[in-house]
Design a protein with these regions (language model features):
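Extracellular calcium-associated, cysteine-rich motifs in secreted modular proteins
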Residues: 1-186
Length: 186
């Protein structure tokens, strides 16, 4: 270092001096791939070097294993809830399914921890124990069955229950207002 009297040695040949109190000091004197740590987290600023910091200006994050831009440290700034899946990074409701509905295991209901799937896309969740469950998870035209007879309440849907409050009747083929089940009510 002919123009810098504070440095005189560079053991790893990276262009940064070995004197820790000198100008442009090398924090890794035996590693030519790293020399500085801007955020003081112990990981070098060169992201492609040994123990490189993916977030050189954030002391709470240093690794991003899946490369989605969210750090792997769960206690750091903007943590990645799914550090091994680049298609997911957050889980607002804590149900284990990612908020990105188009990603792997996407949550159809990112603000409801009791529901995550809706296979028929009718807006009602498939988890029967959750909020607003779909009584017919594979049929998009039906979602509720008030009387529990297996026929849906939506009159415009498939296999509609013509008597949604009577579990003994569901069909009225002739439209006379009386159910077709001879053993049922009315």
């Amino acid at each position: 270092f002919p123009t810098d009297s504070t440095q005189w040695s560079d053991m790893d040949g990276d262009g940064y001096g070995d004197n820790p109190t000198g100008n442009n000091a090398d924090l890794w004197t035996n590693d030519s791939s790293q020399w500085f740590d801007s955020d003081g987290d112990g990981y070098g600023d060169n992201p492609t070097g040994t123990n490189g910091d993916a977030f050189p200006n954030d002391g709470t994050q240093w690794s991003d294993q899946d490369g989605d831009g969210f750090g792997d440290n769960p206690n750091g700034t903007n943590p990645d809830a799914f550090p091994n899946d680049a298609t997911q990074w957050s889980d607002s409701d804590g149900d284990g399914y990612g908020d990105n509905r188009n990603g792997n295991n996407g949550d159809r209901f990112p603000n409801d921890g009791t529901q995550w799937s809706d296979q028929d896309n009718d807006g009602y969740g498939d988890n029967q124990a959750g909020n607003n469950p779909d009584a017919f998870p594979a049929e998009g035209t039906q979602w509720s069955d008030t009387d529990g007879d297996g026929y849906g309440d939506n009159q415009g849907g498939k296999e509609a229950d013509r008597f949604p409050n009577d579990n003994t009747q569901w069909s009225d083929i002739d439209g006379d207002g009386y159910g077709d089940n001879a053993n049922g009510n009315n």
